[in-house]
Amino acid sequence: MKVVSLFVDQKPEGEQSIDRAREFGFSVYPTIAEALRCGGDELAVDAVLSIGEHGDYPTNEKSQVLYPRYEFFKECVKVFEEDGRAVPIFNDKHLSYSFEKAKEMVDDGHRLGFGVLAGSSLPVTWRLPDVELPLECEIEEGLMIGVGGSDPMDYHAMEAMQCMIERRKGGETGVAAVQLIDGEEVWKAGEDGRWSLELLEAALSRSDTPCGLTDEDGRTQDMIGNGEIYRLVENPSAYFIEYNDGLRATLLMLNGAVRDYCFAAKLKDASVPVSTQFFLTPTPNVTYSACLIAKIEELFETGIAPYPAERTLLVSGTLESCLTSRLQGHIRLETPHLDVEYRAPAESQYARQ
């Protein structure tokens, strides 16, 4: 598998595309169309890898960076339509800051018959412990812990949660409503039972990076019981997601409590929650990215996405609506447009070796 052409949208000081092209023998073109045609008159590549990240791009009122992922994608689609042939596209991370644009991207893949894959590396990295929810399991509630800023780290956490709960009985049905709250209201919502303290405890138990007392002297701790979590997390956020089939799930962004991403769920008739950590291997290796690259290679070789782009579509839209909730005063928003239905793959596709 070879890189044969490249388009670079921005070239700040230190940008290495020309050096890499010289080293590895590919060409850099001034437009996406020319890159896809390798300077010729028709589509001349077997697949497209689109990375809309980094760079100097504007931010909207929801604090979303307006990366041109949709625009890159549509430039590719234009070439496919003009040349009468389409090839698979991988789109790094969320499809777009806009659900409307993201849906058009997925629809283009179905319309023209090419594979579309997108998303985070978290769903395909290792899990500690190795947990795969049974397909068609009955989930009563789900909870995810994430860290980092919004947007994009809440996106990564939300997609990790989605890859677990999409395996529930009946498949994915879409999202009926969302609400995002911040600060002390998050803890009050937990006390009131809006999200499960039991699931938070189960998720925290999988973290390898508890902060506070563990950082200070290595002791183990019950962060909820001793109250340490309330001291450590200065500005928690809770993303409440209500699904069309009645399932409720919560993403808690808890900067200061832990440094990793952990999930817990209550399954019907189970006496204790199931929980796991989405393992992020340390720098400089960051081998969880290699797990995602393996799935990209599978898409490119077979033309078939190993898991549906509808997962990323739903997460893209859910996150957008959550950020709209925050912007509009943390109100609950009904989301009839997020009626995205799909089935999870039989195997979860995460790394096991």
Positions of predicted regions on the chain:
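Viral RNA-dependent RNA polymerase
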Residues: 1-4, 9-12, 20-22, 32-34, ...
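Short catalytic/ligand-binding loop motif for oxyanion handling, primarily in non-cytosolic enzymes
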Residues: 38, 56-59, 97-100, 125-127, ...
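Phosphate/oxyanion-binding active-site loops and adjacent basic polyanion-contact surfaces
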Residues: 65-73, 120, 153-154, 285-288
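A contiguous active-site-proximal alpha/beta segment in oxidoreductase catalytic domains
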Residues: 74, 84-165
